[in-house]
Amino acid sequence: MPMTLGYWDIRGLAHAIRLLLEYTGSSYEEKRYTMGDAPDYDRSQWLSEKFKLGLDFPNLPYLIDGSHKITQSNAILRYIARKHNLCGETEEEKIRVDILENQAMDVSNQLARVCYSPDFEKLKVEYLEQLPGMVKLFSQFLGQRTWFVGEKITFVDFLAYDILDLHLIFEPTCLDAFPNLKDFVARFEVLKRISAYMKTSRFLRTPLYTKVATWGNK
């Protein structure tokens, strides 16, 4: 039985999950929910099923794999990663995984707050001012490694790729001063299964966010 990934028909919190499912060659199908247009942003497609799926904390995204029913995007990522030994092996690697997992979520939330705000134009200016410093930290953390944890890819590389690509859409020059990050993005995109997936109609680079967002909703 293929796994079922449920989420809105956007990129959002499912991007790294979809990429990891593709990279690992996992058998899965998607249930994509559509949100209505303004001003109501009707969510009935999702709400009509929300409490009928047997989820402990009903939310999107969710992953159903037989008797395993999982919500929270990072919990889903870790579940898939454990099946394929992509969580780091040594204690040092696991520490780096944990740090980057949480740092990526922080940055993702910061950008989302800007993009969902009615004060987007004002907040964008402030965000762009601090962006080089934030990107520099990612560059330093990667260093000369092939992947963020070492020479072997782990699930946090999928999170890091998502974050960096999001910011390239937000500000296309943001990685210009950081060649190791540009190389990382290029290295990730030429992975055989990732490259193949990106050429399919199933691949969603955009919309980044739901229709409620001020920016990134198309």
From Swiss-Prot:
Q: What Pfam families does the database record attribute to this sequence?
A: GST_C (PF00043), GST_N (PF02798)
Q: Which GO terms describe its biological process?
A: glutathione metabolic process; long-chain fatty acid biosynthetic process; nitrobenzene metabolic process; xenobiotic catabolic process
Tell me which residues bind substrate. Answer: Y116
Is the keyword Transferase assigned to this protein?
Answer: yes
GST C-terminal domain location: 90-208
Tissue note = Widely expressed.
Q: Which UniProt keywords are listed?
A: Cytoplasm, Lipid metabolism, Lyase, Transferase
* Gene (UniProt): Gstm4
Read off the PANTHER family from this record.
Answer: GLUTATHIONE S-TRANSFERASE, GLUTATHIONE S-TRANSFERASE MU 4
Q: Which family does it belong to?
A: Belongs to the GST superfamily. Mu family.
- EC assignment: the record states 2.5.1.18, 4.4.1.20
* Swiss-Prot/TrEMBL catalytic activity: RX + glutathione = an S-substituted glutathione + a halide anion + H(+); 1-chloro-2,4-dinitrobenzene + glutathione = 2,4-dinitrophenyl-S-glutathione + chloride + H(+); (13S,14S)-epoxy-(4Z,7Z,9E,11E,16Z,19Z)-docosahexaenoate + glutathione = (13R)-S-glutathionyl-(14S)-hydroxy-(4Z,7Z,9E,11E,16Z,19Z)-docosahexaenoate; leukotriene C4 = leukotriene A4 + glutathione
- Subunit comment: Homodimer.
Q: Where in the cell is it found?
A: Cytoplasm
UniProt cross-references to InterPro entries, sorted A to Z:
Glutathione-S-Trfase_C-like, Glutathione-S-Trfase_C_sf, Glutathione_S-Trfase_N, GST_C, GST_mu, GST_superfamily, Thioredoxin-like_sf
Q: What does this protein do?
A: Conjugation of reduced glutathione to a wide number of exogenous and endogenous hydrophobic electrophiles. Catalyzes the conjugation of leukotriene A4 with reduced glutathione (GSH) to form leukotriene C4. Can also catalyze the transfer of a glutathionyl group from glutathione (GSH) to 13(S),14(S)-epoxy-docosahexaenoic acid to form maresin conjugate in tissue regeneration 1 (MCTR1), a bioactive lipid mediator that possess potent anti-inflammatory and proresolving actions.
- Please identify the protein, giving its name as recorded: Glutathione S-transferase Mu 4
| UniProt feature coiled coil, ranges | none
